[in-house]
Amino acid sequence: MRNYYIFSNGRIRRKENTIYIENEQGDRKAIPIEDVDTIHIFGEVDLNTKLLNFICQQGKTVHFYNYYGFYSGSLMPRERNVSGHIVVKQVEHFLDPERRFYLAYSFVEGAIFHMVRNLREYKNTDEFQEKIKKELSNAVETTKISELMGCEGRARDFYYEAFNTFLKSDFSMGKREKRPPRNPINALISFANSMIYTTVLNEIYHTQLNPTVSYLHEPSERRYSLSLDIAEIFKPLLADAIIFKLINNNMIKLDDFEEDVNYCYLNESGRKKFIREFDQKLSTTIKHRKLKRNVSYRTIIRIECYKLIKHFIGDEVYAPFKAWW
């Protein structure tokens, strides 16, 4: 099974066990449903309830993105891996300040580890590495989630500041701006983070975890905040590594972006370039030192979810994934 990304405007229809994607020019592409894992829709596409019911019955997920390429929402089938016991345990760990803090700190620890790991690949970043590691030391001394997030935020600011030492000059970082991103590197980071978020959400869906109960990010309405927690670990490892490759190997250029008044975003060409590398990265396998077999990066994210379940039920204390190679 694979992910499908729809960029063109048009319509999607179902006929028997096949999905047909038709663009505005009338060109059609047939996709057998058994070949689909997830559908990502970036274009303006017409759908009907017959198709949506079919997709849900087959246990497939659809993610929607707005005009600028940023995540809008998801069609998630009815959960098939429901466990009231796991949900209760998740909530217990949220309500207990000590247990919640442990998990929140773990996500920050995993994120900072991979930030420093990325910077080790580049010259003239030692000072930034030390500042980032200092924030992790500061985080150990905190007692509140808000203080912990402050340490993580400062560490990430130092991390982004370091980008200017090794990224090509066309992609000067400036400061991190999300809403909206105002330059190409900020637009690329925001798009990449959206893709990490939806990938993590997909993997959570295949487990018994409830994606709305989180520990570092405050649970709230209208978002799957556990996806944000787990994504912290993988944004530097996956998204940022791809960004560095695209920019420094001249695989993505300024004409892959559109700039509006106080706004910058990836155009279709730029999105396709990132997604091509992203899909390839998710499929790349490494020899897992504990499982003693090759697993893909996508599977590593799924394993992270299972590690949390083991932690909740008391089988094994959770430790964040840290790339060892």
From Swiss-Prot:
InterPro entries per UniProt: CRISPR-assoc_Cas1, CRISPR-assoc_Cas1_C, CRISPR-assoc_Cas1_HMARI/TNEAP, CRISPR-assoc_Cas1_N
GO terms of molecular function: DNA binding; DNA endonuclease activity; metal ion binding
Alphabetized UniProt keyword annotations: Antiviral defense, DNA-binding, Endonuclease, Hydrolase, Magnesium, Manganese, Metal-binding, Nuclease
Annotated EC: 3.1.-.-
Any one biological process term the GO annotation gives: maintenance of CRISPR repeat elements
Family matches, as Gene3D superfamilies: CRISPR-associated endonuclease Cas1, C-terminal domain, CRISPR-associated endonuclease Cas1, N-terminal domain
Pfam hit, one: Cas_Cas1
Annotated positions binding Mn(2+): 152, 217, 232
Coiled coil: none
Cofactor(s) listed in the protein's UniProt record: Mg(2+); Mn(2+)
Record text on subunit structure and interactions: Homodimer, forms a heterotetramer with a Cas2 homodimer.
PANTHER family: CRISPR-ASSOCIATED ENDONUCLEASE CAS1
Homology family: Belongs to the CRISPR-associated endonuclease Cas1 family.
Known function: CRISPR (clustered regularly interspaced short palindromic repeat), is an adaptive immune system that provides protection against mobile genetic elements (viruses, transposable elements and conjugative plasmids). CRISPR clusters contain spacers, sequences complementary to antecedent mobile elements, and target invading nucleic acids. CRISPR clusters are transcribed and processed into CRISPR RNA (crRNA). Acts as a dsDNA endonuclease. Involved in the integration of spacer DNA into the CRISPR cassette.
UniProt xrefs under HAMAP family: Cas1
Protein name, per record: CRISPR-associated endonuclease Cas1 3
The organism of origin for this protein: Thermodesulfovibrio yellowstonii (strain ATCC 51303 / DSM 11347 / YP87)
